[in-house]
Amino acid sequence: MANLFDAPQFIEDAPSLAVNAESHTTATQPAVIFDDVGKVFANTRGVATAALANVTLNVARGEVFGIIGRSGAGKSTLLRLVNGLEKPSSGAVRVNGVSVGELDERGLVTLRRRIGMVFQHFNLLSAKTVRENIALPLKIAGVPKAAIEKKVDALLELVGLSAKRDAYPASLSGGQKQRVGIARALVTDPDILLCDEATSALDPETTQAILALLRDINQRLNLTVVLITHEMQVIREVCDTVAVIERGEVVETGPVWRVFGDPQHDATRALLRTLVHDLPTDLAERVKPLHDIAQADAQILLDVRFTGADAREPDLGGLASALSVEGGRVSFVHGGIDRIQGHAQGRLVVSAQVRANADSTVQAQIATLLERARRYANHVEVLGYV
């Protein structure tokens, strides 16, 4: 697979193009800064609606930064501020050290040549071949034909479509169309790649392949990627950092492993629900509240969570031994442990037997279970008993 660093940077041959972003900023400064950004839209009757409010974020150079939220949360508006398709009503958006809102039309053209865009619905020209679709931005910029051909060939190899260079979009699968879109976005050697729900129109298998391609491109080219999505699985697979947006405000942000392992906001927990190991219906129907417990022998269900904050791996064997109070049975009935960015995290539902005797009540044994479980996990609570 080709490395674009091996190909000449043909964008320099195009007329009226700006100096590289490195002249405006340093490699240690964020690629994108949202500084207390607000965006207000007014309808035809002059009624104002706040799409974004008080958004402050830093996107580090070379990272994959994910923005997630439900439909209408403000994700697309936030993304459009980066390339100047929208201007902030308040605050500032800085890209490579330049305030986007202060640029004139010529400055915006220059900015957009350093920012690639990948769309949800591909936006390919049906009457042009794969090669022609990818080459279009360079052709418009006046780059020599020989240079265009060489660059397009390198990109086709990078995205795995060399055999499709003369095919038309109608003959391509959804995943192949998106690969063309990615190649086209990279043809001007951008510093930043914006992805607007780039996988939401794809099947799960194709989605995985496109996400792997985006991560490969990010690592090969040290390219800053900003993507928006409503799918937590996309964030989990490809992002380094995530920001959760709800009703126009960023309610939570941080490394993906930390946000997934210990979500702090209800909106984040709601979005994560598709990935969380909830109790199966048959088990949930059998669980009784703890205050109803009367028998001297019961199976207590504990919700045991690992956030990934600890350097050590979860010691499940030690946990099982610790919960065997008075020799009672212990079993893991549901859940699992996953790894995100090198951090082991997850949720387990553990069944532990308690039996009252002359020396200890059921309530005392439950208290012992909780105390012991908390030595091994970050969060533990009693779900009830069966």
From Swiss-Prot:
* Domain (ABC transporter): residue spans on this chain: 32-272
Q: Which SMART domains match?
A: AAA, NIL
Q: What is its EC number?
A: 7.4.2.11
Among SUPFAM superfamilies, the record links this protein to: ACT-like, P-loop containing nucleoside triphosphate hydrolases
What start and end residues bound the annotated signal peptide? none
What reaction is this protein's catalytic activity? L-methionine(out) + ATP + H2O = L-methionine(in) + ADP + phosphate + H(+); D-methionine(out) + ATP + H2O = D-methionine(in) + ADP + phosphate + H(+)
Q: Where in the cell is it found?
A: Cell inner membrane
Q: How does it assemble?
A: The complex is composed of two ATP-binding proteins (MetN), two transmembrane proteins (MetI) and a solute-binding protein (MetQ).
Name assigned to this protein: Methionine import ATP-binding protein MetN 2
Q: What gene codes for this chain?
A: metN2
